[in-house]
Amino acid sequence: MKFRKINCAVMFLLLSISIQSNANTLPADLSWENNNNAKPWASPLATKGGKFTDFILTFPPTLRTVGPDSNSSFRSYINANQLGLTDFHPNTLEIIPQIATEWAYGQDGKTVFYKLDPSARWSDGNPVTADDFLFTLDFMRSKHINAPWYNNHYTNEITSVKKFGDHTISITGRVAKPKEELHYYYGLVPTPKHFYKKIDKNWVKKYNWKIIPNTGPYQISKIKKGKRITFERKSDWWAADRPLNKNRFNVDKVILKVIRDTNIAYKHFEKGELDSYALVLPEFWHNKAKGKLYDNGYLEKFTFYNNSPRSSSGWFLNTDNSILKEKPVRIALAHALNFDKVIKTVLRGDYERLQAFHTGYGEFSNKNISARKFDLKAANKILDEAGWQQRGGDGVRISNGQRLSLNLVYGRKEHSDRWSILKQDALKAGIEINLRLQDSSSHYKTIMQKQHQIASLGWSTGFRPAFWQHFHSENAHKPQTNNITNLDNKNIDKDIEAYRAETDSNKRVKLANALAQQIHDSAVFIPSFKVPYTRGAHWRWLKFPDAPGTKTSSTLYSPFGDGGIFWVDSKTKIETKAARKNSTKYSSVNKTFDQYRENTSD
Amino acid sequence: MQGYFTQRLLLTIPTFIGITLLVFTLTRLVPGGPIERMLAEAQLSSGETASSAEGFGSQSLSEDQLDQLKAYYGFDKPIITSYLEWLWKVLQLDLGESTRYGESVWDSIIERLPVSIFYGVTTMILTYLICIPLGIFKALKHGAPFDHASSAFIFISYAIPGYVIGIACVSFFAANLEWFPLGGFVSDEFEELTLWEKIKDLLHHAFLPLIAYMAGSLAVMTFMMKNALMENLSADYIRTATAKGLSFSSAIKKHALRNSLIPLATHFGQNISVILSGSFLIEKIFNIDGIGLLGYEALVERDYPVVMGILVISAVLYLIGNILSDICVAWADPRIRFGEAK
Amino acid sequence: MLTPQAKKRWIKFKALKRGYYSFILITVLIFLSLFAELIASNRPVVIHYNGELHFPTYGDILPGTSFGYDYQWEVNYKDLQKQFNLEDKGNWLIMPVIPFNPLESDFIEGEYPPYAPSIESKHYLGTDMAGRDITSRLIYGFRIAILFSLFLLAVTYIIGVFIGALMGYLGGTFDLVFQRLIEVLSNIPILYVIMIVASIVTPDFWTLVLLLAAFSWMGLTWYMRTETYRENSREYVMAARAIGASHSRIIFKHILPNSVSILVTFFPFSVVSGITSLTSLDYLGFGLPAPTPSWGELLQQGTANLEYQWIAISAVAALSFVLTLVTFIGEAIREAFDPKKYSYYE
C-alpha cells in the first residue's frame, strides 16, 4: 500500500496562484506532528556497493509517468524514486515523513499543512520548494498531458494548494476525510518547475524519453532502447541520513534487462545473470525452482507472507442476463464451483480461496463473510426448487426450453486449466460453462460493454474499499462503468452513499462491513483466489535483514520504494562463483516468514 | 517484354491500395483499440500478486475527454477520410507515429531493420548453400540409403515448428551445456570488442536462432531442387547430350543444373518479404529485437500505425519480389517470354 | 471405375513402399480416430448391470440414480467398477484401453499434476498440467486436426480450382481482377484477422476452417490457372469447342480431369499445412477454445514446462510422426503421377 505519487500544469494559472499565495498566512492554532520515532525496517549489517540485476518483460513505451502509455509496469520504478510529502510505514501504516518533515490538520477536516525539508534537492542540484508543489497542480490539470483521469482528479478532488513561504504549503481537498485518507488521496508529489518551465501541446512527444529530475535515492543513468535501463545510486542523496533511510538503498547500480519470455529469463537467473527471481506462480515455484543449484545452497528460496489489500478477483455475474438475473441460479452456481479443488491441484495448495470482494483492508474488510462452499447437494437442491429440475440428455438442466449454459469470458491463457476443472464439477450440478478466452483488450471491451454473462477478472486494490464504482446502480446497465454485475439495489445504493459521505473512521468501518454482507447476499460476485504471500529465489550473495520484507511488501526484491533493504555481499559473490566451479556445497536454504500472515480463518 | 513489366508495375498500385485499405478497415473494426487498452490498464489488476493502484480508476471520463482521446489516436474521423489522410502521408514517406512508443514508425522499423536483414539474408544464403548441393546429391543418389535417411531427417525437422526447435536449442545448448548465450543479438559489451571479436560474438549469438530459422525452409528447398534436377535429368536433351558423348557430369553442369535452378529463382523473389518479417516466436525466444516481434507486439497492443507501417513495407517488398522473380526466371531461362503467351 | 491411366498410377504408387505403407497406416489411424470414443473414454464400452447390457459410449449420460446412487449427474464409472468388483454380484463392465476422456482431470491423492507416464495409473503417456490424460488428448487432437485439414482442403480446393480454372479459361479482365484480389489476400496478415474474429466470437471448428480457407485458396489457383491455360490451347479442347461444346462442359469434362494430377500431388502438402496451421494457432491461443484437445495446446504446455519432458516429447513425436507420414505419401504420389520415368545413371 504505497503512498502513490500523484504528479504534476498551465503557466498563467500558476503565476496567479503564487502571487496570491505569497500573501497567505498560516493559521495560528496548528499542532504539528512528525512521527520521527517510527521504527526502521532495515538492518544495520547492510553494506553499500555492488549491482543488482533484474528483468522486465517489455521495454517501457515511455519514461513519462503521466499521459498516453505511461501506465506500464515500469512506471513504478520511476515513481518509487519520486518522493511524496509523506508515506505510510510499510509495517505499522503510520504516516512517516518524506519531503515533508512535519504536518498538521486544518479545522475544516479537508486541509493538511506540510513543512518541507529545506535540504530536499532535485537530482540536478536545485532545491525542492513550495512552488514545485503548486506547479504539480497546474501540470496535472493541463490538457496537454493527455491524461484525463489526472485532469479530473486534480481538478475535482484537490481544490487548492497554498504556499506559506518557500517551505510550507497546505493542500485542500474536495471533501472532509479521515486523517490518513487525506494524506493518501490529497497528498502531492512535487514536479520540477525549473525543468519543465512550460507545458505546451508538444509535451507528450517532447518528454517521451527525457529523464526527469527526481528526489529519490536513484536516478536513471543509462538507457539502451529495447535492451536495458540502468539506475545509479546518488552518492550524496539529501535524505540518506534520515533514520528510516539508513541501511537502505545499498546497491550502487540497479540494472533492468529486457527479457521477453519468463522461461528464458529464469535461465538467465540460473546462470547468475539475474540476482533474483520472483516465483509467485506455483508452476515456477514447484517445477523450476529445484535441482542442484538449490540443493547446493547457491540459490536460496524465501516465502514471505504479507498482509495487504487483495485484488478483488473472481467471477462477476451479469444480472442483466436472462438466466443470471435469477438469484437462486447465482447462488447455485457459486455452490457448484470447486475452487478448493483447483487450489489443491493445479495451484498446488499455494493460493488461498478469496472469501469476499474486499479482503486485506484491515477492519474495513468484513471477516465474518466467507465465500459459498462447493456443495453439489445444495446447488442441485436450489436449482431443483427454482424450476430447473429437468435435465437434458447431456446432463445439463433445462427450463422452458432454455439450457442452463453460461459463457465465461476470461483474458489470460494460463487460467484455462483452472476453469476447465471448475467446468467439470459444475456439470454435475447441471450447469454447463463454456470457456471463452479473449485477448486482454477485447476481454476488457466485452466487459465494459456489459456483453458478458460471466466475466473472470481481478480489480486492482485501493487504500480503502471502493463500493460506488462497482455496486451503485448509477453505474449499472450502461457501458464503460465498473459496475459489471449491473447490481441495482436501492438499499445498497443508500449505504454506499452514506459510506462515501462519512468522515468518521469507526462509522465508515461499520458501513463497509454492512455493505460487504449485502454484496455477499446478492451473490453477484464469486470470489476466486488470493495469493497470501510473495516468494522467490535469489543468489546467496543477496543478503537480507532478519525480516526480508514488510507487512505490505509485494516483492522481496524491490530495490526502491519502501524496499531497498537487501544488500550485495561482494565477498560471498566471489566465493559462490568459485564454489559453483568446483562444486563446493553449502546448506540448502528454504525459509518461510509468516510473522504477518493473516489468520487463515478470516 | 518492357511493356509487360511496365504493365505489371502499374498494376501494383491497385493491389497496394487494396491491401492497405482492407487492413486499415480491419483495424477500425477490432474491438478494444488503444483507448480501451488505456482504460483497462488504469483499472485492472495486472498480476497474481496483490498490487496497489492509483485509486482513481473509479472515475469515468466525460464525453469530451473521450473525444479528446479519440482525436489523439486519430479515431475521430470516418474510415475513408482517415485512410486517405494516412495514404497521403505514406506517399510522402511518412508512416506516422506509434501510438504506444510515441515515436516515428519509420524510426522503429529502421532501428530493427539491420537485425532482421542479418537473420533473413543469412538464413537465405545458408539455406541455398545447404539445399542446392544436398538436393543435387539426393537426386543423383535417388533411392539410395542416404537419400532415405536424409529425407526422413529433413521431414522431421520440417514437421517440428521452428519455435519448438528454438526452445529445445536454448534449453539444451544454451542453458544446460552453456555453449551458447541465452539470447540477444550481440553481447552487452559489443562496442568495446575488436572487429574479429565482434564477428565471433555475433556468430556465437546467431548460431542457435539460425538453426531454428532454417529448420523449416530446408525441406521445401531441398526437395524443390531434387525434384527439378530429377525432372531435368530424365529430359530428352540430357539423353541426347550424353548420347552425343558429353560426359554425364558435364551434362549436368552445362544443362540440367541451370534449368533446375529456375524454381529456386522463382522462390527467391517471393522470399524477399519473408526475409524481413521473420518469425516473431523465434525472435521472442532468442530475445532478438526484429521486425517480426515489433509487428506481433504492435498487433497485440493495438498499435495500429506500426501494424500499418510494417504492412506497407512488406506489401511493397512482396510486390517488388514478384516482379523480381519474373526477372530472375527470365534471366535463368531465356526461353521464357513474358507477356507474349496471350 | 478406374481408368487405365489411374490404375497404372495406383500400381506405381503401391510399388513405392515407403509412401504406400504410410498411406495404409494413416488411413487406419484416421479410421480408428473416428471411433475414438471406444478407445479413449471415461465411459465403459459395455456394462452388464442386473442382467441388462448397457452401451453408454454414445448418447445420453447415465445418471448415478440408474445404478443405485443418489446423484443425478453422470455416474462415476471408476467407482462403479470398484463397486462391481467388491459386490461380486455378477455385474461387470469393460473400460476402453485408455479409460479417460480428453477433458477429464484425473487427480491422484497427495500428488500434483502433471503425472509422469505410468502403466499402473493407465496414463500411458502421462498427464498434462491439468491432470488430463495425454494419450487421450493426442487421439482426439489427431481426429480434430486431421478432419480440420481435410475440410480445409476440400474448401480450398473447391474455391481454388473453380477460380483458377475460370481465370485460365476466361482470361482477360476476369483474370486480371482476380490476380489482384489474390495478391491482396496473400498480403493480409492472417493471424491478425483471426485475432479480430476471436475477439468478436470465440472461433469454433467451422469458423476456423472458413477463415483459413478464405486466406489459403490462392496457392492452388495459380497452378490451376497455368494448367488451364495450357490445356486450353491443346487440340482436343479446340476440337470440343469446334463441335459446339459449352464452356462448363469443356471445363468439367475436359480440362478438370486432365488437371487432376497436379491437384492430387498437392493433396498431402495441403494436409500438412492444414495441421501445422491449426497447431500454431492453438499454440498461440487463437485456435479452438479451451479445453478442446489439441496438439498445439499440448505443445504450448510442453514448451512452457520443459521439466516435464513427457508432455513436449509426446506432442512433438506425434506431430512429426503424422506429418512425416503424410509427407512420405506426398512424395510417393508425386512420383506415381509423374509421367516421366526417371533415368538413373551409374
In which residue ranges do the predicted regions lie?
Chain A
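Alpha-helical secondary-structure segments
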Residues: 53, 129-136, 168-172, 178, ...
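Extracellular/periplasmic solute-recognition and catalytic clefts
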Residues: 143, 147, 221-232, 257-321, ...
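Detector for C-terminal structural segments
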Residues: 35-37, 56, 77, 224-229, ...
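Aromatic- and charge-enriched surface segment that lines or borders ligand/interaction sites
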Residues: 101-146, 170-172, 258, 265-268, ...
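Gly/Pro-rich hinge or "lid" segments in bacterial periplasmic/extracellular proteins
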Residues: 82, 89-94, 186-248, 253, ...
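Surface-exposed binding/hinge segments that line
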Residues: 115, 150-198, 217-224
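Ligand-site clamp/hinge motif
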Residues: 206-209, 237-289, 423, 427-440
